[in-house]
């Protein structure tokens, strides 16, 4: 099971943290600091797996990470997870971010944190891997983006309706409105203009 997913830069600033087990906020901050110190001290040419720190569960857990440019992508997992499988999952995550943001960088993670969390939620839920097919993940994210855009259009609908009514050129104000069998009497109103 995946216990946490952490992304931080070369200076230890967290850019994303997702915990799948309950930890207090102080403990989460300690885990992030400890993980950064463990991972950042390692040479580039060494293995990308190491035993979890004391806070994340000790020797029963592993830290699996990759370092891309200025960012560390770290998955904290228990012993039931495959190290190579998680390395591949990190690669899929980074490539998916790259497709969604067209050459992802640290600023994308800062300014589009909600979208990054959506991408991550398509891949991992409750510490379990849901999807590893990058094309399927991108398709789902594109569908979410289209839905958000269509909902944004609905938010302005009342204002557009009021504007349309104000701009209507009626020769006179109707006194009765007939809709099918229903007749509605319109009270005397001042001019719309």
UniProtKB/Swiss-Prot annotation:
This protein's name: AP-3 complex subunit sigma-1
Modified residues (Phosphoserine): 191
Assembly and oligomerization: Adaptor protein complex 3 (AP-3) is a heterotetramer composed of two large adaptins (delta-type subunit AP3D1 and beta-type subunit AP3B1 or AP3B2), a medium adaptin (mu-type subunit AP3M1 or AP3M2) and a small adaptin (sigma-type subunit APS1 or AP3S2). Interacts with AGAP1. AP-3 associates with the BLOC-1 complex.
Domain of life: Eukaryota
Membrane topology qualifier: Peripheral membrane protein
Gene Ontology cellular component terms for the protein in this record: AP-3 adaptor complex; AP-type membrane coat adaptor complex; axon cytoplasm; cytoplasmic vesicle membrane; early endosome; Golgi apparatus; intracellular membrane-bounded organelle; presynapse
Entry comment describing in which tissues the protein is expressed: Present in all adult tissues examined.
Role, per record: Part of the AP-3 complex, an adaptor-related complex which is not clathrin-associated. The complex is associated with the Golgi region as well as more peripheral structures. It facilitates the budding of vesicles from the Golgi membrane and may be directly involved in trafficking to lysosomes. In concert with the BLOC-1 complex, AP-3 is required to target cargos into vesicles assembled at cell bodies for delivery into neurites and nerve terminals.
InterPro entries referenced in this protein's UniProt entry, alphabetically: AP_complex_ssu, AP_mu_sigma_su, APS3, Clathrin_sm-chain_CS, Longin-like_dom_sf
Keywords: Cytoplasmic vesicle, Golgi apparatus, Membrane, Phosphoprotein, Protein transport, Transport
Places the protein is found: Golgi apparatus; Cytoplasmic vesicle membrane
GO terms for biological process, alphabetical: anterograde axonal transport; anterograde synaptic vesicle transport; clathrin-coated vesicle cargo loading, AP-3-mediated; Golgi to vacuole transport; insulin receptor signaling pathway; intracellular protein transport; intracellular transport; melanosome assembly
Sequence similarity: Belongs to the adaptor complexes small subunit family.
